[in-house]
Amino acid sequence: MNPDVAADLKELSTTLEGIESVMDLDALRAKIAELEEEAARPDLWDDVEHAQRVSSQLVHRQSELRKIKDLRQRVEDLEVLYELSEDEGDDSGLAEADSERTKLKKDLEALEVRTLLSGDYDQREAVVTIRAEAGGVDAADFAEMLMRMYVRWAERHEYPVEVYDTSYAEEAGLKSATFRVNAPYAYGTLSVEQGTHRLVRISPFDNQGRRQTSFAGVEVLPVVEETDHVEIPEKDIRVDVFRSSGPGGQSVNTTDSAVRITHIPTGIVVSCQNEKSQLQNKAAALRVLQSKLLAKKKEQERAELDALKDSGSSWGNQMRSYVLHPYQMVKDLRTEFEVGNPDAVLDGQIDGFLEAGIRWRRQQDAA
């Protein structure tokens, strides 16, 4: 085999091995099995929202595993195709192998981006808000164009979209819209879209056909996950027992059945004395403590989300321009990635921008 080709094939295989390691195929298979078991429950659809989330996560993770298996098979098949074509002197076979090698590189690069999503919230679903900014009716129309772009992107990947709110402008377009993309890693992927987007075109709303510049802001936040159960390590609590007391402080129990639990890391204290036994009072107190810790956790998450809103990727940062006139070009101002077909981009073909943005963000974090 040609040494350059052999080295290239080895690099492709090594890249795939790295992806398989980061994505942890054993853990991925275990998660799929867990979701399949959940999806098979007869009472699953009693909670429609939960059922839809389980179904979406199952489809997404099955797709991830299938992609990796397909890529592994393609790497192996490509090596065989090169060997057979070289042995038989088949030029058309070699040309086919070269073409497949180029495609395989591109597909591996796209999947490799997924391994860069390792932030605290990256694995979560996303809530996207789009608002018209400067530019009047053109800005409102642009906001609607952007919403369609993201919805089409989600549809291309078979990600469910749930629209929370749309506020329509008087003449055309949207004042604002908020929607949720129900797919794992939607936040990590779409968060690079946060910022101000700029549109330059001949305005369809201008009677004189003048060129107009308008702006729309995109905000991307992770979905706060509901937690049904809070684990409390035994080492994190101190349990004190005392006699139950009634009106006026008088003892109503001759045994020390009442329980007071102190959560050492937070200082939260709860007590229970209404149950008949110490074990029952402890169990009840633990349930109260779990509720208090869950409420505290959600308060902290809300504060963290507020901090994300004020992070560097703010609304005021112009990050992409969509030029429809006098030439046609969509260009990311951070990564320099550009596409000369705005129609395709506005129809949801934005994976190139997302991949470039994720790589750029990783470089910025490492700097």
Curated annotation (Swiss-Prot):
One of its GO terms (cellular component) is cytoplasm. The keyword Amino-acid biosynthesis does not apply. Gene3D superfamilies: 3.30.160.20, 3.30.70.1660, Release factor. The modification N5-methylglutamine is found at residue 250. One of its GO terms (molecular function) is translation release factor activity, codon specific. Keywords: Cytoplasm, Methylation, Protein biosynthesis. Peptide chain release factor 2 directs the termination of translation in response to the peptide chain termination codons UGA and UAA. Belongs to the prokaryotic/mitochondrial release factor family. This is Peptide chain release factor 2.
